[in-house]
């Protein structure tokens, strides 16, 4: 949590994706990762990427948005939370909503257990090697993007189209 004075933001990762076949700027499949402390130029560059986005996709978005606000990033975009998406698609029936569980369910790229391995050794994310941090963040970003794409396909099914306004309303509360 950014509200705990002992916690610090150590990295930001993001990618650009096209939605419904419409290309977007920078849609090159790359994952952009920057470790903290971040210079003002990178914050400006990241803010520009946020400003150009049609919307932001995140898993457990309230966590990410709190950190972005803490470092001065304004996010006035529509936010779509893959955790909320899944809750809505399951029509409120309890299920596992972690990114790892959804990655397994949708058979998409999964985060590696790099963070889990570090935590089991009493380390924090910031204690991991830069290479391991980048790997973890890459898989986190790509897992979220791929889960989102699978969820979008489910929302397009006739039996789920009525759920879209509910999803939008719930996601609006988190942004």
Give the positions of each predicted feature:
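Residue-level detector of short coil/turn "hinge" positions at structural boundaries
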Residues: 75, 110-111
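Mixed-charge, glycine-rich, non-catalytic linkers/tails in nucleic-acid processing enzymes
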Residues: 74-77, 119-175
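Exposed alpha-helical structural elements
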Residues: 41-45, 98-102, 114, 132, ...
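Short alpha-helical "patches" and their helix-cap loops
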Residues: 28-38, 103, 157-168
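Conserved RNase H-like, two-metal-ion catalytic cores of nucleic-acid enzymes
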Residues: 1-98
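Generic, well-ordered alpha-helical scaffold segments in large soluble proteins
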Residues: 49-53, 67, 71, 82, ...
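Short alpha-helix plus adjacent loop in nuclease-associated cores
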Residues: 79-109, 117-128, 132-133, 137, ...
């Amino acid at each position: 949590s950014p509200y705990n004075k002992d916690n610090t933001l150590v990295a930001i990762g993001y990618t650009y994706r096209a939605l419904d076949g419409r290309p977007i700027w920078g849609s090159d499949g790359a994952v952009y990762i920057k470790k903290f402390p971040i210079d003002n130029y990178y914050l400006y560059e990241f803010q520009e990427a946020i400003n150009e986005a049609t919307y932001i996709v995140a898993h457990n978005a309230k966590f990410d948005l709190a950190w972005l606000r803490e470092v001065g990033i304004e996010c006035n975009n529509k936010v779509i939370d893959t955790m909320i998406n899944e809750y809505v698609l399951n029509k409120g029936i309890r299920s596992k909503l972690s990114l790892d569980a959804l990655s397994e369910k949708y058979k998409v790229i999964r985060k590696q257990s790099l963070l889990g391995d570090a935590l089991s050794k009493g380390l924090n994310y910031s204690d991991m090697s830069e290479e391991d941090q980048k790997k973890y963040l890459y898989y986190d970003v790509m897992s979220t993007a791929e889960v989102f794409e699978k969820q979008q396909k489910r929302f397009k099914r006739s039996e789920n189209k009525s759920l879209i306004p509910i999803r939008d309303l719930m996601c609006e509360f988190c942004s």
